[in-house]
Amino acid sequence: LTDERSMLEVVRVGGDGVAAPPRKLALNEVSLIRAQSGKMVDLDAEIDGELLNRYHADGVLVSTPTGSTAYSLSAGGPLVWPMSRVVCVTPICPHSLTNRSVVLPDNMTIRLRPRERRGRFDSMVYSLDGRSAYPIEVGESLVIRKAPETLSLVHLRKQNFGALLRAKLRWQGGTARREPGFRDGLFIIGRDLRPLPAQ
């Protein structure tokens, strides 16, 4: 059994509007966060060239359906069925309680633009799937869209996302332990093929 998971394409754009190669790919999420602990950052989120919101927060996540059960979930984002054609924009610990996660069609282009606050810029970094952090400066931006590539997952057993959620989140009708078949024999088709460790 196989399924195709959507990915995100990320390009850093300089203040002159020129994209800085190479583009990067993320399976779960792209995070734009503060570089220093104890400081909040300011940034704009734009959707297809229109301002969505100005955030004063620890950062912002853009996640795929696959990533909705990862960092995005911890930040208060929604749970999304893996095959849904959407992306989620979720603020991390926003200063305003009215700032909530937004679910968008995956054909939209998202731009995250760092901002100064009272003439000062607090340094930020961005990362993909929690890997290496890359610095970003004021005047630069991240352009995020659905990638043309997908990631193929092979399951040796039929997967049930509802059962996975019940087990992982300990909902009623679920169990505190891993249900049989949860990620058993899961392979990623890519640069190498190897079983993922059971969780």
Question: Language-model segments: which ranges?
Answer:
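Catalytic core of DAGKc-family lipid kinases
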Residues: 1-58
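Short aromatic-centered micro-motifs
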Residues: 45, 67, 126
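Short Pro/Gly-enriched beta-strand edge/turn motifs at strand-loop
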Residues: 24-27, 92-94, 123-127
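A generic structural signal for well-ordered coil/turn residues at beta-strand boundaries
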Residues: 4-6, 26, 39-41, 56-58, ...
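Glycine-rich beta-alpha junction loops
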Residues: 12-14, 34-36, 64-68, 93-94, ...
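ATP/nucleoside-binding phosphotransfer catalytic cores, i.e., glycine-rich phosphate-binding loops
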Residues: 15, 19, 32, 48-51, ...
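Gly/Ser/Thr-rich active-site loops/lids in small-molecule metabolic enzymes
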Residues: 50, 54-98
